[in-house]
């Protein structure tokens, strides 16, 4: 039986996996979400010796069950290849008291590569499957990493255009240059004078604008998304949690069946939601620890069951988590209220109208899976230094948020279960923050800090940032947040 993906806001709006990938966001504003979970046989006696690609085949064939085996083989072999700088794709590193799952070995040195290297192949395969001749326009808001990873994935892919919006003052210098120097005739990057929430809200508005959709259709185009709102972004992220567990079994750190915790630095809630889906298909998960920075709306939600975005937006050293409207939480809410689309829609409309919603009558077993805490700026910097001094290993600030939150969790609960930290970016993406935390040195430029980081860590400077300083800037457009749609129409000649 083919798996059904339903909009979180309309029980009648159901599609297959390939249709969900092509649409990105449901036309009613909801997110396509599985209403039941596939049956997957996770035999870790076998999986411990499986390659990343083999684990991907097992997981993806379960969730994307209207793709043929040959189609998935094609997508997987083209995605997880020499673009990654290690055959392991996502190596697990044992540190003092924790395991870091390094998700930054792809072409843009951030975890988004894990899904965005395969999403273009999913899309072009799905388009062929449905005889779609429209040009697919990828419209994406980024808090720093998705934009570059999406453009790297879609650059010069036939039949696609990609337009990325980022907050002008809300990304690191390295992140900005990675985007503005992006090659590819179909790539477009636009800075906005707002924050990530402004960018994401306006992108969602464009997806839901019927008149704009009709204008696109008249020009043989249609929108899709490379954000984690797209199920094709989310499902590949389930793979690395299963792979990490298999590596723990392989190295004798755990026995098969032993429960493991995952601590995930969380902004838009996609990465930790993928860990939740891994649990739903049988991965032995103890706790999912949701780590936030000072934009701690999720920490408060898990403690009070009230989601309240009415608070100061803080610009931090972990910009990919500087988010107050956490889009993917909608999928968890949908599951928490028993897959009730009417109730989910009411809550989401309340968020727009009043800036908050309160959860009542929810599945306590699901909520009990999660623990949540946050790390402030000082704690994040201190954690980078602590890990370096303990393990001679430098974490990026997002990973350090998760690492610091895990230290708090362990102290407060006494939980000694093995814990994997999702290490979401290379420190080379945030060199100034990393070097300053370790050495106390201030006032460094980004490229000066890259050299110092190399000396401190002994890790080679990755190609993603090597030469960035002298790469030609190709994208110069900057607009007011309110003018985003006009910019899109201009680029597409509508």
Each model region followed by its residue ranges:
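PLP-dependent amino-acid enzyme catalytic core
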Residues: 1-494
């Amino acid at each position: 039986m083919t798996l059904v993906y339903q909009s979180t806001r309309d029980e009648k709006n159901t599609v297959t996996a390939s249709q969900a990938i092509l649409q990105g966001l449901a036309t009613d504003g909801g997110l396509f979400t599985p209403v039941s979970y596939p049956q997957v046989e996770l035999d870790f006696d076998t999986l411990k010796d499986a390659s990343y690609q083999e684990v991907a085949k097992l997981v993806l064939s379960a969730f994307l069950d209207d793709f043929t085996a040959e189609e998935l083989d094609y997508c997987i072999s083209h995605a997880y290849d020499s673009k990654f700088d290690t055959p392991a794709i996502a190596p697990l590193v044992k540190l003092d008291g924790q395991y870091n799952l390094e998700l930054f070995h792809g072409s843009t040195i951030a975890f988004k590569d894990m899904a965005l290297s395969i999403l273009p192949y999913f899309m072009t395969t799905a388009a062929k499957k449905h005889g779609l001749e429209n040009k697919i326009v990828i419209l994406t808001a980024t808090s720093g990493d998705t934009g570059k990873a999406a453009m790297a994935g879609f650059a010069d892919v036939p039949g696609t255009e990609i337009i990325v919006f980022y907050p002008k003052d809300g990304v690191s210098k390295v992140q900005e240059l990675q985007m503005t120097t992006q090659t590819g005739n179909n790539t477009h990057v636009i800075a906005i004078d707002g924050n990530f929430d402004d960018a994401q809200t306006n992108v969602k508005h464009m997806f839901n604008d019927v008149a704009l959709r009709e204008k696109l259709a008249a020009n043989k185009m249609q929108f899709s998304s490379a954000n984690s709102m797209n199920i094709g972004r989310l499902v590949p992220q389930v793979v690395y949690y299963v792979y990490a567990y298999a590596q723990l079994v392989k190295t004798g750190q755990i026995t098969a069946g032993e429960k493991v915790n995952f601590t995930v630095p969380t902004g838009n809630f996609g990465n930790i939601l993928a860990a939740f889906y891994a649990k739903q298909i049988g991965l032995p998960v103890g706790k999912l620890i949701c780590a936030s920075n000072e934009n701690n709306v999720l920490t408060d939600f898990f403690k009070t069951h009230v989601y309240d975005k009415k608070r100061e937006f803080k610009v931090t050293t972990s910009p990919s988590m500087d988010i107050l409207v956490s889009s993917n939480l909608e999928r968890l809410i949908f599951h928490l209220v028993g897959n009730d689309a009417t109730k989910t829609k009411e809550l989401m409309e309340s968020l727009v109208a009043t800036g908050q919603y309160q959860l009542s009558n929810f599945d306590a077993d699901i909520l009990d899976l999660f623990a949540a805490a946050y790390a402030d700026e000082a704690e994040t910097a201190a954690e980078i230094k602590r890990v370096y001094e303990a393990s001679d290993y430098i974490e990026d600030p997002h990973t350090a948020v998760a690492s610091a939150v895990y230290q708090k969790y362990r102290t407060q609960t006494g939980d000694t279960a093995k814990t994997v930290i999702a290490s979401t970016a290379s420190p080379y993406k945030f060199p100034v923050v990393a070097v300053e935390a370790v050495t106390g040195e201030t006032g460094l430029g980004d490229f000066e800090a890259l050299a110092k980081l190399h000396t401190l860590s002994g890790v080679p400077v990755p190609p993603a940032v090597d030469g960035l300083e002298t790469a030609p800037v190709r994208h110069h457009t900057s607009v007011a947040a309110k003018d985003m749609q006009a910019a899109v129409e201009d680029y597409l000649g509508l």
